[in-house]
Regions:
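Core dinuclear metal-dependent hydrolase active-site scaffold
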Residues: 1-45, 118-169, 281, 288, ...
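Pre-active-site segment of Zn-dependent metallo-hydrolases
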Residues: 9-14, 18-72, 76-115, 162-169, ...
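Active-site neighborhood of phospho(di)ester-bond hydrolases with catalytic His/Asp-centered motifs
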Residues: 28-30, 47-58, 62-63, 74-78, ...
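Metallo-beta-lactamase
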Residues: 88-140, 256-285
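Acidic, Ser/Thr-rich peripheral helices and adjacent loops at domain boundaries
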Residues: 96, 100, 249-269, 325-348
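Active-site-proximal loop/helix segments of hydrolase catalytic cores
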Residues: 138-143, 151-177, 182-184, 189-191, ...
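Cap/insert and terminal regions of metallo-dependent hydrolase folds
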Residues: 163-241, 315, 338-397
Length: 409
């Protein structure tokens, strides 16, 4: 079968890969990089079937462009489909507000949802003599790996985490011939999660004890809920704002994808929700505010940031990746942010914590060795070659975006 990455092979972001053979063409994921303006993958040819691993924009953000055009089936978990719909609609909303290119229409999103064929972990379908199974990826609720089997089996990981988080269990390895695997954390390992949680909670209490406000900018999908679950046993006035509220409700609609539904339900009850703009005045008087956007570039976080930025007693606790050319990265590197076009110095405390939902360098290596593939194909990484010294017993393939290569499937 012929394979080609349309994006995301040698970079983190805008994922997309075609598989072509047996008279059919499959597209696995089709995302965008949510930069300013967004960056898109290479144009997709006509597609017969599309497989979506999960709902983050770098994996799902361009799916409506293909499905709106080709009316192809979209195989994914029902939870990923519903959250992806939120993300796609938000992408259009931002494009209109910022005068960016609109890569698809609202009608394309509607057609995409009509073309969804729900699958869940353990399900298997057959398309043109190729069996396709779905496995738990452990990244965020509803995230999946796909196993394609004909003469041999091929696993496509999407984004994975092999260690359990509060929100989801970890991914389990499975023997395979070909393993397409992400390499986001090609050059470092995460600190033990328990240590990170302990340090984070200690800082929260320290800031509140000195009379400050704790602002936790979070991604809507996964990180907001993970942090809410971590904070739920604290006896403080806590608020949650932004799209994370809607995502939490969707997660609770699909408890089968959660490690412990009761823990998330309990966390949701402990937080006050900002349901209308007027509630933000009350939220600003709270002690802990968990809000989108996770990189400080837009959303409700800007208003809260503006409120506390000159208060040395308060703190911004970053809990997610801060990409280049974002407010979050500028804050880390220069101690300032851009608000309403003006560069502002930030005087409150800043701390960063590693709550990644991706497997780290050593976890990826352990996963590969447990799968014991003949061929390892790295993707979703800008430093894939750093894995090579540890994988001399495997045939490692580092495809470039736009490069076609063949594998037995």
């Amino acid at each position: 079968m012929k394979f080609k990455f349309l994006g995301g092979a040698d970079m983190v972001g805008r994922m997309g890969m075609t598989m072509e053979g047996d008279g059919m063409r499959i597209l696995v994921e089709y995302g965008l990089s949510p930069t300013k303006p967004p960056e898109f993958p290479l144009p997709a040819p006509k597609i017969d079937h599309l497989f979506l691993t999960h709902c983050h924009l770098d994996h799902c953000g361009m799916v409506p462009q293909v499905v709106g055009r080709d009316r192809c089936e979209v195989f994914t978990t029902p939870l990923s489909a519903e959250v992806a719909e939120l993300m796609m609609k938000d992408t259009l909303k931002i494009a209109k507000a910022e005068d960016y290119v609109q890569p698809y229409s609202g009608d394309d999103i509607e057609r995409t949802m009509q073309c969804v064929v729900p699958m869940t972990y353990g399900d298997e379908i057959t398309i043109n003599h190729v069996d396709v199974g779905m496995l738990d990826a452990g990244h965020v609720p509803g995230a999946a790996m796909f196993e394609f089997s004909r003469d041999v089996n091929t696993i496509y990981s999407g984004d994975i985490h092999t260690e359990a988080q509060r929100l989801v269990k970890g991914a389990k390895p499975k023997d395979c011939h070909n393993l397409f695997i992400e390499g986001t954390y090609c050059d470092r390992n995460h600190p033990p999660r328990k240590n990170t949680e302990r340090d984070f909670l200690a800082k929260v209490e320290e800031v509140i004890d000195r009379g400050g406000t704790v602002l936790v900018p979070c991604f809507a999908v996964g990180r907001t809920q993970e942090i809410m679950m971590l904070l739920k046993d604290l006896d403080y006035e806590m608020w949650v704002d932004g799209m994370g509220r809607s995502v939490t409700r969707l997660f609770l609609d699909y408890p089968e994808y959660l490690r412990d539904e009761r823990q998330l339900r309990s966390a949701r009850k402990k937080f006050n929700e900002v349901r209308r703009p007027g509630s933000r005045e009350a939220a600003m008087k709270g002690q802990i505010i968990v809000t989108t956007g996770g990189m400080l570039d837009g959303g409700p976080v800007i208003r809260y940031l503006n409120k506390i930025k000159n208060d040395p007693k308060s703190a911004i606790l970053l809990v997610g990746y801060q990409a280049e050319d974002t407010n979050g990265r500028m804050l880390m590197d220069q101690g300032c942010v851009t608000i309403d076009g003006e560069v502002c110095k930030v005087a409150c405390e800043l701390q960063k914590y590693d709550f990644s939902a991706h497997a780290d360098h050593d976890q990826i290596l352990d996963f590969i060795k447990a799968c014991d593939p003949d061929n390892v194909i790295f993707m979703h990484s800008d430093g894939r070659e750093k894995f090579l010294p540890d994988l001399t017993d495997y045939n490692v393939i580092l495809p470039m975006t736009g490069e076609e290569f063949e594998l037995d499937v």
